[in-house]
Regions:
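Short, surface-exposed coil-to-beta transition loops
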Residues: 61-64, 79, 93-99
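Short, cysteine-centered beta-strand-loop-beta hairpins and adjacent loop/turn segments enriched
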Residues: 84-92
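A solvent-exposed, acidic/Ser-Thr-rich amphipathic alpha-helical stretch
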Residues: 21-74
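Hydrophobic beta-strand positions in extracellular immunoglobulin-like domains
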Residues: 82-84, 103
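A short hydrophobic beta-strand element
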Residues: 73-82
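Short beta-strand edge/turn micro-motifs at domain boundaries
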Residues: 100-122
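Short, low-complexity N-terminal intrinsically disordered segments enriched in polar/charged residues
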Residues: 1-26, 107, 125-134
Length: 134
C-alpha cells in the first residue's frame, strides 16, 4: 500500500468513528473538496467541518469501503462502495463511487467525488430541513 492510500485510510477510519477532528487532521489547510457537481466546492478546514455536519444530518453512512485503488505520484484514485440511508426519506441505497485525491506532504489537498447524482442528492442544511418540517 502506498503512502497516499495510508492517509486516505486514516481519514476513512476517523469518519467511521465520526471523529471529525481526526478526519480534518488528514487535510491540508487549503483543502478543496468537490462533492456534488451542482454545488461549489468546500474550501478550507472550516468549510469541511460544516460539510461533514450537513452530510451527517442528511445521511447515515453505514458502510464506506475501497474496492480498488491506484496511485500515480501525488494522485490517488479510489473505486469504492458506500451504503447510505437518506435521513429525510429513510431510503437505503448502495452508492458505487470513484474518488480522486491529491496529496502534498502527507495531507489531502484536493478531493473529487464521482457517483450517480440521480440517486444521491446534496443534503439539505440542517436548519433548512427543520424549517421545512415546522
Amino acid at each position: 500500500m502506498g503512502e497516499n492510500m495510508k492517509v486516505v485510510e486514516a481519514m476513512m477510519a476517523a469518519w467511521k468513528k465520526r471523529d471529525v477532528e481526526g478526519f480534518i487532521a488528514t487535510l491540508a489547510d487549503d483543502i478543496e473538496y468537490h462533492w456534488h457537481p451542482t454545488k461549489r466546492p468546500a474550501v478550507g478546514k472550516d468549510k469541511m467541518r460544516k460539510f461533514l455536519s450537513n452530510y451527517e444530518a442528511g445521511f447515515d453512512q453505514q458502510e464506506w469501503r475501497v474496492v480498488h485503488s491506484a496511485e500515480a505520484g501525488n494522485v490517488l484514485f479510489v473505486e469504492g462502495m458506500e451504503v447510505l440511508v437518506d435521513r429525510s426519506t429513510g431510503v437505503k441505497m448502495d452508492n458505487p463511487f470513484v474518488q480522486v485525491f491529491e496529496l502534498r506532504d502527507g495531507l489531502i489537498t484536493r478531493m473529487r467525488d464521482y457517483y450517480d447524482t440521480s440517486q444521491v442528492h446534496a443534503p439539505a442544511k440542517p436548519d433548512a430541513a427543520q424549517a421545512q418540517s415546522a
